[in-house]
Amino acid sequence: MEEIKVSVVIPVYNVEEFLNNTLSDITGQTLKEIEIICVDDGSTDTSCKIIEEWQKRDSRIQLIKQKNQYAGVARNNGLKQAHGKYVVFWDADDLFERNALEVMYTQAEQERSDICICEARKYDNAKEKYIPSDAYLKENLLPEKQTFNKFDVPDYIFNLTNNVPWNKFYFKK
């Protein structure tokens, strides 16, 4: 069995309309040494059936079922099953660049980082396009170098990003 470089944990709750796109996006990542852990949080729609169909096509996909306990518990249960060196928590309606995992993995390995944070864009339904959002990563506060620590930005290290888990790439071991 190949080494699992990244575990992708996805909390799932009644997201049938998004799941096919999200699973297609993740299975199509350029980094192939991944596992995809879908944690169903008591869905009442066809979310589990969609995941089970994907499992037939891709052995990297796992399904964990739990009663409804909300996304935090689902993420924690997925984390308990994760075997990757790194872990990301993506929501079922998230889409990422095809090379997102590979870029973050390579950067984390080169810099021996404990966490990588990526920018995000959100879809503006009225304008029918993606727009930048500094709510997830305040690029104007970042130091010029890509890799930094709390000593580089001591006054606002905790203000650089908000508390969403899906734009972060974590060292697990």
Model-derived features: positions:
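Nucleotide-sugar donor-binding/catalytic module of glycosyltransferases
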Residues: 1-173
